């Protein structure tokens, strides 16, 4: 009888301990959680220049990577990146796979239904990119009867669907893939953000084969995406962004990567 009592007591202690751990985790705020972990886990693509991409040494770099580093440093946290296709980043954030997303994410009304966004740290607008010398496209709204390429899950996929009238919509994991198909003649134009298009044309070996047509459409804020009910972490991130806007870092980074300020 005594042995059975000791076994039952041990099991009860384990159960109560587990319940205590769960209760502590459930009562932690988002900021307390990352501070306890000692790191900020960031979801990003790694294939969307100039925001997030691999350099010649296969190391993550870009505008978003610098911002992630600044935020983590200001919060006294280590930094961990998790890469994946853009279409999976917001769902992954909602599922708790990372703490924030920095990957050129437009703060659209649709996305705001499932996640929150920080203050903007860049601006973006959709443009049409065509093969140089191609006729028949005057801008992103001129898509009637056209085959249009777009990055899967991007805000520009939503823009294209909103405008409508296209013959076919092809989706791609990143800008490099969509522009490769454009150059190969498989799409009439690619709908993408102006900063990403300008950077590709400037720095890619095939950039001289394509060009931007028309004016930016439907300008949006680019911001840090964060899970709902993460108010204290969101506030902390906003303070960092505001601080860097005031001390000149914001403008320096914008000029470095885009050749313009926002």
Language model segments and positions:
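C-terminal motif of bacterial Sec signal peptides marking the signal peptidase cleavage site
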Residues: 15-18
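Ligand-binding clefts/hinges and TM-proximal coupling segments of bilobed small-molecule sensing domains
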Residues: 21-26, 157-169, 208-214, 236-262
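Extracytoplasmic small-molecule ligand-binding "clamshell" domains
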Residues: 27-103
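Short helix-initiation/N-cap motifs at beta->coil->alpha
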Residues: 29, 80-91, 135, 154-155, ...
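Short loop->beta-strand "edge-of-pocket" segments that line small-molecule binding or catalytic clefts
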Residues: 38-44, 140-153
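Acidic, polar ligand-binding/catalytic clefts
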Residues: 69, 78-141
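A ligand-binding cleft/hinge motif common to bilobed small-molecule-binding domains
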Residues: 105-113, 159-162, 183, 188-218
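Periplasmic-binding protein-like
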Residues: 123-130, 194, 198, 202-242, ...
């Amino acid at each position: 009888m005594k042995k059975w009592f000791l076994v039952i007591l041990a099991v009860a202690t384990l159960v109560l301990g587990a319940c205590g751990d769960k209760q502590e985790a459930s009562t932690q705020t988002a900021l307390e959680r990352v501070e306890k972990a000692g790191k900020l886990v960031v979801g990003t693509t790694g294939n969307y220049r100039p925001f997030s991409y691999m350099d010649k040494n296969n190391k993550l770099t870009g505008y978003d990577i610098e911002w992630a580093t600044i935020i983590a440093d200001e919060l006294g946290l280590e930094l961990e990146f998790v890469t994946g296709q853009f279409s999976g980043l917001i769902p992954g954030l909602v599922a708790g796979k990372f703490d924030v997303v920095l990957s050129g994410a437009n703060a659209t009304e649709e996305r705001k239904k499932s996640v929150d966004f920080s203050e903007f740290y860049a601006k973006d607008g959709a443009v049409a990119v065509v093969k140089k010398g191609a006729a028949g496209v005057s801008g992103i709204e001129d898509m009637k009867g056209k085959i249009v390429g777009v990055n899967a899950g991007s805000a520009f996929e939503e823009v294209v669907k909103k405008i409508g009238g296209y013959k076919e919509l092809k989706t791609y994991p990143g800008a490099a893939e969509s522009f490769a198909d454009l150059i190969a003649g498989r799409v009439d134009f690619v709908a993408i953000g102006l900063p990403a298009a300008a950077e590709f044309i400037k720095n890619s070996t095939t950039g001289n084969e394509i060009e931007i047509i028309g004016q930016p459409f439907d300008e949006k804020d680019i911001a840090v995406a964060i899970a709902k009910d993460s108010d204290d972490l969101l506030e902390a991130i906003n303070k960092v962004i505001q601080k860097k806007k005031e001390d000149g870092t914001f403008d320096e980074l914008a000029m470095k990567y885009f050749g313009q300020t926002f």
